[in-house]
UniProtKB/Swiss-Prot annotation:
NCBIfam families referenced in this protein's UniProt entry, alphabetically: hxl6Piso_put, PRK13209.1, PRK13210.1
UniProt keyword terms in alphabetical order: Isomerase
UniProt entry tagged with the keyword Magnesium: no
Protein name listed in UniProt: L-ribulose-5-phosphate 3-epimerase UlaE
EC annotation from Swiss-Prot or TrEMBL: 5.1.3.22
Keyword Lyase among record annotations: no
Pathway: Cofactor degradation; L-ascorbate degradation; D-xylulose 5-phosphate from L-ascorbate: step 3/4
InterPro entries per UniProt: L-Ru-5P_3-Epase (IPR004560), L-Ru-5P_3-Epase_Enterobacteria (IPR023492), Sugar_Epim/Isomerase (IPR050417), Xyl_isomerase-like_sf (IPR036237), Xyl_isomerase-like_TIM-brl (IPR013022)
Enzyme class: isomerase
Top-level taxon of the source organism: Bacteria
Species classification: Bacteria, Pseudomonadati, Pseudomonadota, Gammaproteobacteria, Enterobacterales
Family affiliation: Belongs to the L-ribulose-5-phosphate 3-epimerase family.
Catalytic activity: L-ribulose 5-phosphate = L-xylulose 5-phosphate
GO MF, one annotated term: intramolecular oxidoreductase activity, interconverting aldoses and ketoses
Amino acid sequence: MLSKQIPLGIYEKALPAGECWLERLQLAKKLGFDFVEMSVDETDDRLSRLDWSREQRLALVNAIVETGVRVPSMCLSAHRRFPLGSEDDAVRAQGLEIMRKAIQFAQDVGIRVIQLAGYDVYYQEANNETRRRFRDGLKESVEMASRAQVTLAMEIMDYPLMNSISKALGYAHYLNNPWFQLYPDIGNLSAWDNDVQMELQAGIGHIVAVHVKDTKPGVFKNVPFGEGVVDFERCFETLKQSGYCGPYLIEMWSETAEDPAAEVAKARDWVKARMAKAGMVEAA
């Protein structure tokens, strides 16, 4: 793994649904991926993972050891439902408790990075108070993460509050904590009116991982690779030239497809071809 120039992973929701992590990691290995990113979204099923028993957590660790496929990151999108910026104190408290549990879970199973959704609120109307509560919630969250040595990394979103690296850097400077970094999504970044290459260069010292997907203006999910607006080769070239050596994660939602593995293999080959054109050579 450490000899590979490009650590390449796949999002959990790209693979067949289910709770057997040994099978999921075995499939990811068969498909040639180095790691899988876990999803803890707003559904009760995936939220319940944060209450796994010691035995369930150990089963995940054992699956990682057995397959050699890591689970180094978690996409924590549960805060759509329980936002840190909520003006309802009970909802906000639930959001902070989810954060605490996620950090503890990460510490237990070896997850290094928790990707955060940059929403002050999602299903409610945002205002100055929701943004203030969100900032305060992030500050409290980063304090918890610091004690656990777990990195919280902000995603560049499909939402105006956090739709550029420049905006996310504002939060990084505000929090001024090494355990808060950035996890850009080049699809989301490209779907807005951003100077994508400048944005990537500006954030390079704070980027801990990169989501890879295609998008169109106003369409942030399920755009087939090559049918959107993302200039993948330029993005990969910029990241390479800027000195980025971290992981790339192909983000897809093909878990309910007729043949998820075939969809993933097709996307993997497409992305790797663009990486090769950008001069990113895989080590054998």
